[in-house]
Amino acid sequence: MLSLLPLWAQALEVGERLTPWTLLDQFDQAFTLENQTQTLLVARSMDAAKLVGAALQDQPKGYLEARHAVFVADIQRMPRLIAKMFAVPAMRDYSYRVMLDRDGRVAPRYPGAVDKVLWLQLKDGQLVEQHEYATAAQLREALEKALP
């Protein structure tokens, strides 16, 4: 029971302001979470990241940005050599930016299932609501509803 205490302590509450952070994307370009961000997508595993990729398949470049959405991928468990030599270079072909949490500084702030994509809906930097998506179809539908 005590082992669950850290998860409870980290749980986000509606109305809570998200602490700003800065991560590098797959092009080593910095991104800082700001009040303009309306949707934060968090993937804690390769399977969850693949859901995002499938949901964004065939979408034009700038699709997430037009929706004021940001995608964070937790890649801390990926061996650094694999990330550097193969995974991150492959991500450069994506039509969307991926904020890479290489050291687990950001994704653990937002508790959720490892195999699902966490959707945090924000307004002026505060959490309005959150959802988890287990399929690419569900995530795609939600993104389509988040019209620019």
Give the ranges of each region predicted by the language model.
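Bacterial N-terminal signal peptides
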Residues: 1-6
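Boundary at the C-terminal end of the N-terminal hydrophobic targeting segment
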Residues: 7-11
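A short beta-strand-turn-helix
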Residues: 20-37
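Short active-site neighborhood of thiol/selenol oxidoreductases, capturing the structured segment around
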Residues: 32-50
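Thiol/disulfide oxidoreductase modules built on the thioredoxin-like
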Residues: 34-35, 102-138
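Structural microenvironment flanking redox-active thiols in thiol-disulfide oxidoreductases
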Residues: 48-90
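Short, internal strand/loop/helix patches
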Residues: 70-72, 87-114
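A short, polar/charged loop-to-alpha-helix boundary motif
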Residues: 136-148
